[in-house]
Amino acid sequence: MSTATFTLGIVGARGYTGAALITLLTAHPAIELIFVSSREYHGQPVAAHNPTYCGDLRFETLDPAAVAAKRADVVILALPNGNAAPYVHAIDATAPPTLIIDLSADTRFDPDWYYGLPELTRHTYTGQKRISNPGCYATAMQLAIAPLRDQLAGPPQCFGVSGYSGAGTTPSDKNNQALLRDNLMPYALTDHLHEREVSAQLGIPVEFMPHVAPHFRGITLTANLWLQRPLTREHIKTLYATRYANDPLIDIIDPPPWVNQIAARHTVQIGAFTMAPGNKRVVIVATLDNLLKGAATQALQNLNRALGLDELTAIPYQPNPVPSPIP
């Protein structure tokens, strides 16, 4: 007999984020995974694709009505953008008490959905059952900018580089390893979805220039911030350390963080704090794993809080190593 308190299903579990979710949820003491939906893997054992899972579940092909009929306590939608609405409508009609966590961008601009970036928005959570998980780049940008948001003299300029897992599993130039070899691929250099997302959440215009690199996972985000008045490096670093003092998944470090030290970790590193002459411009670097804190880990934080559990339940975090100085 299971001792789990809550039942949970995942829709869209074939992708990289779905796999990360299964790994985390398998170790969750209060969650029973009752269905995992994937058309491509239909009928195949979940354990054959995820060695951390030891149960008997098989992937299923479930339409929105079938998902709603499962009446799970929690449904996580890990679908490509543009696909969430039919599932939300079916659950709203059949099982409205179900907690829905949407990992796509479909609900991030909907005021009826709680925007779940816990380190910045947990104080606004009041029991909502519809939670929108932030984007991976958007998470890094907001955490890098937020402590200085009210002291900025102009739009933050953010240069982002992600591993190709951020492009998902559907073949495209952005996850074509042959095209990415020895390459850095710029794309959507203005009006990127995450640029609009961050601008909406922070209430200021943000300029974002994304790129894809040959590595598999991990984001490095360099934020160029102009200040209204001169500030010292020590003041700014203290501002960040104070802002995130009670957030165990945020590491404030002295040097610029390295993306190769964030892979497979649940935390965010924020560092560099490099001042331009005159102390009215600072450059800050943030790194995170796009599949974890940029997706699955953040979903688990939101799930835990919504279920009344400790926010970090089943998140095996540890401080990241600090990069060694370049000789």
Curated annotation (Swiss-Prot):
Keyword Transit peptide: no
UniProt xrefs under SMART domains: Semialdhyde_dh
Highest taxon, organism lineage: Bacteria
Keywords for the protein's UniProt record, in alphabetical order: Amino-acid biosynthesis, Arginine biosynthesis, Cytoplasm, NADP, Oxidoreductase
Pathway: Amino-acid biosynthesis; L-arginine biosynthesis; N(2)-acetyl-L-ornithine from L-glutamate: step 3/4
Biological processes, Gene Ontology terms: L-arginine biosynthetic process
GO cellular component: cytoplasm
Catalytic activity, EC: 1.2.1.38
Catalytic activity: N-acetyl-L-glutamate 5-semialdehyde + phosphate + NADP(+) = N-acetyl-L-glutamyl 5-phosphate + NADPH + H(+)
InterPro entries: AGPR_AS (IPR023013), AGPR_type-1 (IPR000706), NAD(P)-bd_dom_sf (IPR036291), NAGSA_dehydrogenase (IPR050085), Semialdehyde_DH_NAD-bd (IPR000534)
Catalytic residues, chain numbering: 136
Biological function: Catalyzes the NADPH-dependent reduction of N-acetyl-5-glutamyl phosphate to yield N-acetyl-L-glutamate 5-semialdehyde.
Stated family: Belongs to the NAGSA dehydrogenase family. Type 1 subfamily.
PANTHER family (alphabetical): N-ACETYL-GAMMA-GLUTAMYL-PHOSPHATE REDUCTASE, CHLOROPLASTIC-RELATED, N-ACETYL-GAMMA-GLUTAMYL-PHOSPHATE REDUCTASE, CHLOROPLASTIC-RELATED-RELATED
Name of protein: N-acetyl-gamma-glutamyl-phosphate reductase
Organism: Xylella fastidiosa (strain Temecula1 / ATCC 700964)
Gene from which this protein is expressed: argC
